[in-house]
């Protein structure tokens, strides 16, 4: 449900697009990306599901965990939690020997499996990194707008609440600090927006209304 003029959405830094499965959520996310690119805004569409829609719509090969230009001023990336975790470790651990040991042991894979919500947290962390004007990765491109094709409403609520959950669990330390950063991004009404996609049917509308209530 777009309850404000589209130009207001395109002036945000981050847009989360969600809705009940099957209502055209991914199509709306891509359409917003195309419109933003036509307005001259350097835009990246972020997909968090295993199925890529943006590259397929533009008849290109799957992009994977790479920022690939699929049209003028329009990029796409598919975020894989394991790749996000690996990138996070590379940014946090400065000692190469420690990084190599961690990757060889696959410890971070076991950690993700044993920590509910960690995959979602590192995924949102990558979204945050993409939205920074001062990118953390080498040669990171600066984007005007990051459009996230977020999970459907059932998972979408818990997905967007993940940083707050981790900030409450980890009361101190880097996890707490970084989770607060992510939560601030999600709740920043000036720079972040949420687009709720629905159909004129009772169940999709009710789910969208519930999600809106959860987010406010």
What is the predicted role of each segment?
Residues 82-83, 110-119, 166-174:
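Flexible beta-alpha connector loops of hexameric P-loop NTPases
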Residues 36-39, 63-77, 111-126, 150-160:
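Charged, low-complexity, helix/coiled-coil-prone segments
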Residues 35-104:
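N-terminal phosphate/diphosphate-binding loop that engages ATP/GTP or pyrophosphate donors
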Residues 19:
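The Walker A (P-loop) glycine that initiates the GxxxxGKT/S ATP-binding motif of P-loop NTPases
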Residues 3-9, 23, 27-31, 38-39, ...:
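Conserved catalytic-core segment of NTP-binding enzymes
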């Amino acid at each position: 449900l777009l309850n404000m003029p589209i130009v207001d959405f395109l002036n945000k830094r981050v847009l989360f697009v969600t809705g009940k499965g099957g209502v055209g959520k991914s199509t709306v996310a891509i359409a917003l990306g195309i419109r933003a690119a036509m307005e001259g805004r350097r835009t990246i569409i972020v997909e968090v599901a295993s199925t890529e829609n943006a590259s397929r719509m533009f008849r290109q090969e799957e992009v994977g965990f790479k920022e690939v230009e699929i049209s003028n001023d329009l990029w796409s990336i598919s975020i894989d939690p394991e790749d996000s975790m690996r990138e996070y470790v590379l940014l946090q651990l400065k000692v190469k020997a420690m990084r190599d040991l961690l990757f060889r042991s696959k410890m971070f894979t076991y950690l993700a499996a044993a920590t509910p919500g960690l995959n979602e947290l590192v995924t949102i962390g990558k979204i945050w990194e993409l939205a920074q004007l001062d990118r953390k990765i080498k040669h990171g491109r600066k984007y005007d707008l990051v459009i996230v094709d977020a999970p459907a409403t059932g998972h979408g609520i818990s997905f967007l609440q993940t940083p707050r959950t981790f900030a409450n669990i980890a009361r101190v330390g880097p996890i707490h600090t970084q989770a607060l950063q992510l939560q601030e991004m999600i709740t920043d009404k000036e720079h972040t927006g949420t687009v709720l996609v629905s159909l004129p049917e009772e169940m999709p509308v009710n789910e969208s209304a519930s999600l809106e209530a959860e987010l406010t």
